[in-house]
Amino acid sequence: MNYSYQENGSKVLLTNGFDTRLNTFHDLQLRWNLSKLFNVRISSVLGRKKNASDYAAGRNYFIDYFETTPVFSYQPSSAFRIALNTKYSQKENNSELAEKATIRDVGIDLRYNQVKKGSFSGRFNFINIDYNASLNSSIAFEMLEGLKTGNNFTWGLTYQRKVAKNLQINLNYNGRKSEDSKTIHSGGMELRAFF
């Protein structure tokens, strides 16, 4: 069992005034090894996000949130792991509109490692979101984590390989699909040098 409390904040002076952000939360994590092959992890977070902008009143929010994330993992060897995960979140903005979001997320993660060569990982998630306010606002973007109400799908692939003694290449691909929206694909490549 692990408990932590964090308070992360920033205040930036822009040409039109200050932009202040604050995120405080309590995080409780439990891990239980059912056997050598199976384990369960549960994380619960209770927190508050605040944003105050001098120049854009539409960017002001004060969100109370709760989320719990159970993960069931199967790892038959050090080279392979598969995990089934869920996440349930509730968020509420303390304003006149009282925006509320409920997010249900179910997914699967795979990881395969080859010693001295590289690793491959993939994930797929189904996310259902209920939201009671307008989608075209910065508050909605923050509360819905960039997704839309209704059913959403997200997925990703990552390949990481050591190409030389001090060089590593990372290839990644991410996709997402929301109801009544086109599929969005993005990818990237990164080359790292270690000195």
Segments predicted by a language model, with ranges:
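Exposed, low-structure sequence patches enriched in small/polar residues
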Residues: 1-195
